Amino acid sequence: MQLEKAKETKQDMERCRLLAQRIAEELAPATAAVLNAETPALEKALHRAGVDANPFTVAARQADLLVVEDPAWAEMPAQLPGQVLLVFTGSNVAEGWAEELARRGYYRDFRWRSRGRAQQAALY
């Protein structure tokens, strides 16, 4: 059981590292807010990639990028930063996020594609 848990944790850390590296290289945000993270792995990976990342709070609303892990289980905040990245950890269902983001004037950037071993994500 512990071996299985350790393997899962290692895979999660690698997934977060790859995603953080891609975010830092392609989007280059100075700051990022992470919403709905079960563990701080993505925040830590973003820090290592050179992005000032913190959990989403009222004070973090001024971030350049909002990263939402597993949007099916997160409620959309009233105020959003300039870019929103939906990261699908369990399912790829955004549960109304796409429609609400469109109503608020956000449109999907189809140049951002999910690649290889990196997890599925959608940039708005």
Task: Label the model's feature ranges.
Residues 82-92:
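Conserved beta-strand signature within the Rossmann-like core of class I S-adenosyl-L-methionine
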Residues 1-11:
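Class I SAM-dependent transferase core
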Residues 28-40:
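Conserved class I S-adenosyl-L-methionine
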Residues 9-31:
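Conserved alpha-helix/loop element of class I SAM-dependent methyltransferases that forms part
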Residues 52-63:
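Short acidic low-complexity segments
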Residues 105-117:
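Conserved S-adenosyl-L-methionine
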Residues 71-79, 93:
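A short, conserved alpha-helix within the catalytic core of class I
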